[in-house]
UniProtKB/Swiss-Prot annotation:
Pfam families: Ribosomal_L31. One of its GO terms (biological process) is translation. Its cofactor is Zn(2+). HAMAP family: Ribosomal_bL31_1. Keywords: Metal-binding, Ribonucleoprotein, Ribosomal protein, RNA-binding, rRNA-binding, Zinc. Part of the 50S ribosomal subunit. Zn(2+) binds at C16, C18, C36, C39. This is Large ribosomal subunit protein bL31. Gene3D superfamilies: Ribosomal protein L31 (4.10.830.30). Binds the 23S rRNA. It comes from Treponema pallidum (strain Nichols).
């Protein structure tokens, strides 16, 4: 490898808006993210499932689409 050509690969702190801090390695010094696996609804099990079956049925009735 040539000297001075490649970026430095160093320890990085990834800080989430929820306060969670993840230490990893990267060429970027520090990162701030809005959402992480500790607070994302998909990973915490608090996600909301949208039931669109009623809307689809209403659309099909309105336009008389048989399915």
């Amino acid at each position: 490898m040539k000297k001075g050509l490649h970026p430095r690969y160093e320890e990085t702190k990834v800080v989430c808006a929820c306060g969670n801090v993840i230490v990893t390695a990267s060429t970027v010094k520090d990162l701030r993210v809005e959402i992480c696996s500790a607070c994302h609804p998909f990973f915490t099990g608090k996600q909301k499932l949208v039931d669109s079956a009623g809307r689809i049925d209403r659309f099909n009735r309105r336009y008389k689409i048989r399915g």
